């Protein structure tokens, strides 16, 4: 049964690096196949997700060429935001946030469906040269706002986390002239900082079922390596559509669970 989580991790890792929704596959599997309670499943999922970022980093060197400084800055902000989220988690139960989470997820899903004006919609051409000067083209006030928003996303990821990767991708694609594949690569690796924070926090405050983290993490690493290669060859518009649809489905399920309202007969 434990080895089952390797293919689960591969599927979740691909979903995570392509759409930012790894938990759509991994979290339910931990609940139903492993029989973990919700909190324990979230802990295992966060710990295993670190390997997804590692696999993505190994696979995305082409996209990240010339963008390592930008990635490092984003990771630092996400890291400190994640610390804030972990601290808030000790003071506020995550259940207090469940009623507005569907709004965040739905907003991210809708925004990802709308291409940014700075983005070139290409079908996988290997054109990853960094664009000179794009970092300094914003005013200092806008830069501060971007830093603050990245920090908030990091805090949200450390506190609750659902679809935080989509929110970061939406922000990155709208605040830089990077191609979609580059922003996606930065998102995939940078979000690992929040998962590192969460894992360190849970190591002291909760019990981590490491026997499940290992096979799931192996799968996440493999899926994280495969995902960027898929993004590299698929047209961006199809990735956007898939991500948007999955995000809206997740938003509905979160809405249904939070408000105990079912708009459809089966779910």
What is the predicted role of each segment?
Residues 55-65, 102-135, 249-265:
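Transmembrane helix exit motif
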């Amino acid at each position: 049964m434990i080895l089952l989580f390797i293919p689960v991790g591969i599927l979740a890792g691909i979903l995570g690096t392509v759409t930012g929704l790894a938990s759509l596959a991994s979290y339910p599997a931990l609940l139903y196949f492993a029989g973990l309670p919700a909190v324990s499943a979230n802990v295992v999922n966060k710990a295993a997700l670190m390997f997804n970022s590692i696999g993505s980093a190994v696979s995305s060197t082409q996209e990240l060429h010339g963008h390592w400084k930008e990635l490092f800055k984003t990771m630092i902000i996400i890291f400190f935001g994640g610390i804030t989220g972990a601290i808030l988690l000790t003071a506020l139960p995550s259940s207090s946030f469940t009623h507005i989470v569907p709004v965040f997820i739905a907003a991210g899903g809708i925004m990802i469906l709308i291409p940014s004006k700075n983005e070139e919609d290409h079908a996988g051409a290997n054109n990853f040269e960094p664009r000179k000067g794009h970092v300094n083209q914003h005013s200092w006030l806008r830069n501060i706002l971007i830093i603050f928003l990245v920090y908030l996303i990091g805090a949200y990821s450390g506190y609750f986390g659902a679809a935080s990767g989509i929110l970061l991708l939406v922000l990155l694609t709208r605040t830089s002239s990077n191609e979609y594949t580059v922003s996606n690569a930065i998102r995939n690796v940078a979000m690992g900082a929040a998962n590192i924070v969460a894992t360190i926090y849970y190591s002291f405050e909760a019990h981590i079922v490491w026997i499940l983290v290992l096979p799931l993490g192996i799968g996440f690493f493999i899926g994280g390596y495969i995902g960027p290669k898929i993004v590299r060859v698929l047209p961006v518009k199809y990735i956007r559509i898939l991500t948007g649809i999955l995000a809206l489905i997740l938003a509905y399920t979160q809405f249904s669970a939070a408000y105990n309202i079912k708009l459809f007969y089966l779910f």
